């Protein structure tokens, strides 16, 4: 399998120019597409004669993507690929990546903290906490399962034995807000029989789901959803 890798920071010899780096990488890949590489360089506005030591972080990130794509990998691994890019460059980066995926059907694995951005096009999401995988599911499954519940507060209100995991619990006057994992609409009736006054189920964006998982005080048991 042909594998491409985009590191969070490019570290080839600083004396190399962009053009020399492209020729250097081409030697190691039988499938290197020189014409494609040149078109990427033009599109990404990479100056061919500039030494790598003089590239900005954004330019270095673009060059990393070019070097990873030009041999047309079947699997592309990216480590914080847009961390150093401004909003416009980040959008151009993602558009180029999506075009490559559409053209080649390559599998792309991205490590990033820009959760909301990735959620717009990713099929599958895996969440890690303290080096441990705690959630693996289709992207839509994360938003379906993690909710905030607005409930009426009561002195003896307990979350023990409920059919979902309570990640967090906050009191706001006469109401409480629970962050829960494993929510299903059918659980409304269960809450009613337990005397819980459920007032609202709040849908969360992908980034909010990530935040709730990260700030849960107790370790969250790993969950692996079926494909």
Q: Across the structure, where does each feature detected by a protein language model lie?
A:
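Short loop/turn segments at beta->alpha junctions
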Residues: 17, 138, 202-205
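A generic structural signal for secondary-structure junctions
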Residues: 4, 30, 45, 139, ...
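ABC transporter nucleotide-binding domain
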Residues: 93-185
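C-terminal coupling/interaction segments
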Residues: 179-227
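Generic structural signal for individual residues within well-ordered alpha-helical segments
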Residues: 22, 38, 91, 143, ...
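ABC transporter nucleotide-binding domains
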Residues: 1-129, 134-135
């Amino acid at each position: 399998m042909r594998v491409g890798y985009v590191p969070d920071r490019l570290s080839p010899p600083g004396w190399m120019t962009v053009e020399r780096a492209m020729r250097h990488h081409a030697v190691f890949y039988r499938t290197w597409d020189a014409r494609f590489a040149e078109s990427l360089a033009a599109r990404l506005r990479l100056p061919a004669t500039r030494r790598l030591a003089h590239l900005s972080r954004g330019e270095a990130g673009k060059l990393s993507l070019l070097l990873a794509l030009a041999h047309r990998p079947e699997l592309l691994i990216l480590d914080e690929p847009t961390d150093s890019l401004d909003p416009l460059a980040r959008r151009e980066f993602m558009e180029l990546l999506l075009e490559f995926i559409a053209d080649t059907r390559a599998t792309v694995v991205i490590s990033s903290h820009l959760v909301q951005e990735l959620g717009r096009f990713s099929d599958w999401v895996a969440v890690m906490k303290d080096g441990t995988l705690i959630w693996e599911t289709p992207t839509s499954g994360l938003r379906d399962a993690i909710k905030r519940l607005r409930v009426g507060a009561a002195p003896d209100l307990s979350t023990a034995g409920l059919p979902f995991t309570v990640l967090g619990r906050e009191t706001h006057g006469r109401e409480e807000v629970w962050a829960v994992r494993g929510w299903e609409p059918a659980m409304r009736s269960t809450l009613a029989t337990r005397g819980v006054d459920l007032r609202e189920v709040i849908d969360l964006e992908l980034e909010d789901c990530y935040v709730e998982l990260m700030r849960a005080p107790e370790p969250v048991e790993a969950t692996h959803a079926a494909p």
